[in-house]
Amino acid sequence: MRNYISIALLLLASSVFAYDPPTMGWSSWNTYRVNISDKLIMKQADAMSRNGLKEVGYKYINIDDGYFGGRDASGELITHPVRFPNGLKQTVDHIHALGFKAGIYSDAGRNTCGSFWDKDSLGINVGFYGHDRQDADYFFKEIGFDFIKIDFCGGDAKQNFDQLGLDEQERFTAIHNAILATGRKDVRMNVCRWNFPGTWVHDVAFSWRISQDINPSWESVKNIIRQNLYLSAYASEGKYNDMDMLEIGRGMSEEEDKTHFGMWCIMSSPLLIGCDLTTISEKALRLLKNEELIALNQDVLGLQAYVVKQMDGVYILTKDLEEVNGNTCAVAVYNSTDEERTIHLDFADFYLRGDVSVRDLFERRDLGKYKDRDFSVTIPAHGTRIFRLDGLERGERTVYEAECAWLQDYQEIRNHKAFETAIYEDDGNCSGGAKVTGLGNRDSNYLEWHNVYSREGGLYLMSVDYQCAENRELICQVNGVVVKNVEAHPAHEVASEQIEIRLKPGMNRIRLSNGNSWMPDIDRMVLQKK
């Protein structure tokens, strides 16, 4: 069997395009909430050291909410007198001695989420607010933590006793700067705002939550996948969308657990185990140690799979592996429905040509070589199948859906209509079943494809598919140069305008914008080499 983890590590060492991969490890919140202790954390670290998880890439042991004991007279944090009577340093030293990295938790406001929702009274007035430099020095210079999850209950007036409403960008940026001021450049900061907070987060965090808290149910997993389907553009340059901690081994069916883990892997979410590692079942452990799925998550390109097509609740997603526009890609067929479905894969959707070798990554076995439209798969209800495809050659990508594009003003924490920010929206008339609406009316509210690949460069005919109920205009830029102002005429279905553009060899950026008025809704862009 091919050792995909070894291949990924080799490429990581040699490729100039390699990025730090998503965080892998264990976190205390899902199973224990605030009911933790130093002994419990060390037992979990010991278990992760014994059961082979370290060898496949899990290396962070994260202490979530529940360790706080208030502050002393000088404002320094102190730990819970019963749960952590000896402080945090002893626990962190134990974690480090096992060869792991240690993570911690705090809040951008005054109180933690546990103090409000779990009535953990010692979690009041322990957040970063008013103590940014002091707490950063404590966590990262004095104690030696390597990771931090930062919540926002203390900044959300509905979730703190002071009814304190804070600005997310200001608070998380200030904390980011305080961490940098410690001299530590290796700390991974996770922003926990429970929805995509805005593109500013890419500049301050290693990862960010895109949904409400997970729970061990199919509806929760399905909803989180749904929220992340069209966020692939924001997982870039070694920064990742966080789908929340894993609920593997906590009561869902085998197929649901497989979908949960497989989709977290191919969508490049952090992989933080949330169950009790001292009692984990062999079946759950085997899934969590699947090296071939982990290799998708830890791939050197750091890409999140994007939606190629959807068919009545079945989604096909893909991403390149090891080399951009190379001959290898991963494909997930995800069945969100309550019925078994049979799907035929068309390898042309992935631009693979000739015989294609197919490997099932759940079963960890080769399925043989297939030609275009010759491969079908049956997916049970709530199930997912993930394949590695190796083709003889690869054509250039020609279709770029709008829902795969970067929206500069995109955010999900406030009403997009009130704040006039663009958003992804389902629309059965559009090619991929979705579009981008609410674009334009200011310079920053634009759409941009960051990853338009051309092998040789040259002239292309670019077709922009759109919808609008009235005459509208968009400005097309290629690599920062305005190419054309496009007049879009009323089209309740989908209409198209064509533009001749020139691409350079390698990666290109194509932007659609209008700083003065509203743009049409954008369905997709199609490129044809001239």
What spans do the regions from the language model cover?
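Structural recognition of the beta-strand scaffold that forms the well-ordered cores
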Residues: 22-28, 57-64, 101-106, 146-151, ...
